[in-house]
Amino acid sequence: MNKIIFVLVISFFSILSLQAQSKELGVASEIRNILESSSLGELSHDSKVNFSQYDLLIKFYSKREFKEAWTKEGGLSSQALVLRDQVRESLYDGLVPEDYYLGQLDDIIMNFEIEKMGENALQLAYVDLIFSESYLKLATDLYKGKTPQEAIKTNWQIQAKTVKVKFEEVLESAVKGDSIGQSIRGFWPEYKVYANIRESLRDYYKMASSQEENTPELEYKKLIKLGDRNRLIVEIRSRLIGEGSEVDSELYDSALLKEVLKVQKRFGLNPDGVIGPATISALNETPEDMILRIAVNLERLRWLPDTVVEDKFIMVNIANYQLDYVQDNGLDTLFSSKVIVGKQYRSTPVFNGEMSYIVFSPTWTVPLSIVRGEMIPKIKRDPSYLSRNHMKILTYSGKEVDPAGLEWSTVSVKNFPYMVRQSPGPHNSLGLVKFIFPNKFNVYIHDTPSKSLFDKDIRAFSHGCIRLHKPAEFAEVILQDNALWDKEKIYEAMHSGKETAVMLKKKIPVVILYLTFWTDTGGKNYIRKDIYNRDEEIARALFQ
């Protein structure tokens, strides 16, 4: 008997006593005895294997009267081989196949090919349990995510997915129907983009295995424009086009420009063809870098609740600086607009809610943190700051306070018992309209008077709220089922100088998420800068 077989044998039994007991007890009895004897489910081994899905194993085997699921008459079922292949394929889900006992599955399959194990019921019982443990662990990680979202310090506050499946029942059905592979794929998130991203990860693994070692990192020194000559162009051309014997290798020509523009678009940069520090950084991304990035974003999709695909919903991707109003599982886009999100130290949180009303010509009651942290110092330096910005000081009972009557030299963040409110109008920091989805973060979507900021590549300038580039158009789309609010009425309300709140007939799900990589239905990749430095934390949890 090959030595590897003994990885499945508990160490404190001798081989002879194992065989003697196994002849007396059937496989089902051995499975029951193993599960009864250890609530921790530790499998003695060269290194210990934990039955982390112990509760599900109990449910699965008790319903089938502890009968084996993966072996028959001493041989492995064809579905055992399918499961092993699915575990290998979990690499392209951004997971680690060894976490699902790939090595043990390979050893078992190899040894079954060498000799039958039908005389050893205890050994067959452990084989069965390992395959079931592998299936259930992979299934739960694909469905819920491998890393608990609350344990990762990435400000992810989206409501956790409600578990709607009974994993043990799905396994039972898959075993009976010889559909293990199909059932595993059924645990993928419902978002169609998941399968697209998964294929991109497969491509990057192929690139990583075929790439030349020690690819030099490009070093930025100065801007390179079309027609410039630069030694760096030689390496850039080699990466994007390949060698060209009849080409001036140091000249930035139109052929290379086309490829540079593709890179800039893929990374969400301004496609101007100018090779600057951001473009150099994009060109320095290796397949290994991309593998980690993609794995992180697959995990984020596994965290998302399925409820947002049931109807129309609003999605804001912070890292992409874009809002999309979509339907049909995100495949049909009804509206899109650039957005501005929170600065790194006032980052926009990742959460979900329901948009319930719109406010035209809004006032702005300045959050106390901004009043204390930013406004009081500005007012002290410039007494006209409040009047220039159309702001008033109010008591919490609503009485207006004359700023000239306050002794500003003695005012501090600790002794300012007032609120500051900005009147409606084009000067208002919220612009001419705000879209409210009540949440504990006091974050909402709104217009802004600072339109020039939308021309920037990196648009992280706000205090956490989401500033919208095309607010009037968005209001039209949101209110299209309300006959009282046509384009003219919306324009009038936005410029009336008086607050008007409009309740939506049906609340719209809103998801504020953070994706730094995704792939569209055409296989085109989109890569975005990790502006809040959140990817590394998740990658560490996934792979370490």
Residue ranges, per PLM feature:
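Positively charged n-region of N-terminal signal peptides that target proteins for export
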Residues: 1-5, 20
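Cationic-aromatic interfacial patches
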Residues: 22-163
